Amino acid sequence: MSTSNITAARAVADPVEKQLLACVEIEAESERVFRALTSEEIIAWWVRPGVFDTREWSCDMRVGGRWRASGISRGQPYVQEGEFLEIDPPHKLIHTWDGAGRPDLPSTVTYLVERFEKGTRLNIRQTGFVSSDVCNAFAVGWETSLKRLAEILVP
């Protein structure tokens, strides 16, 4: 597989504002990228492959519906879940994100899926982190995940 069609994924943490921004450009249709965000296909790329091994993913894809991911991280089981706040296929998706058992600490993830001349640009903004350390860790995770997403979706 050629990686010449992949624009490097980047994620930048803002520890003062406790938010992060991430972006990747992929030579794929917007609908294809959106589907990778909202289907079981997410298991192949999401949540820092190699560190978080996502094994199950389910969702009730509607505003107010819930999503749930589970797997193994560093030998221990993990669960992440949240609620869909806005769904506008294939342009925008917003959901909360929290660890199961920690609903008092949700962050909010906004995905913007935009066409551009060579394919699709995926911008992510995650806000509401409880600490700068958590924000920095998520930035590393998003960059790794987006690199994997780009590899999978390159024709």
For the regions a protein language model found, what residue spans apply to each?
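Charge-dense, helix-prone N-terminal extensions
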Residues: 4-6, 17, 57-58, 62, ...
